[in-house]
Amino acid sequence: PPKGKSKHVSPLGDDNSQMPAINISEGFNLGFCRCRPGKGPLMHNHDTNETFMPITGKWRCEWNEGDELEHVDLGPCDVISFPPGCSRRFMNVTEGEEDKDHLLLVVIAGNAPKAEFTDLAYERIKQFETTNN
């Protein structure tokens, strides 16, 4: 969030979702996440399903929070899909390559999907803002 602090955001970024290069209704959004080990988004959910497939590296996909938290680790070409409303996050957990980015393919259903961070994710954002201001 912070920009406007809206609880609902586009998974593709505010600017990208507002001005698409090709204005069509394809029914899905496809993108890549590139990051180093230990990095990934905070826990969130979407109003549509979301599918992940690692291209390189090892990625941990988590769902639910607290005592209900579960996860699975995926390697290249493994696939996992989360239903609408299920809290989820992913993180690069590749070992021995701390300075190397890895790639995760992300497919989000729908023409205008929305994302919502969980309450615990917002607590982490507030903690970060407090310690970095």
Where are these regions (language model features)?
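A short, N-terminal "cap"/entry segment at the start of jelly-roll beta-barrel domains
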Residues: 1-27, 133
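Short acidic-glycine-tyrosine-enriched beta hairpin
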Residues: 25, 49, 53, 65-84
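Short beta-strand segments in beta-sandwich/barrel cores
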Residues: 31, 40-42, 50, 57-63
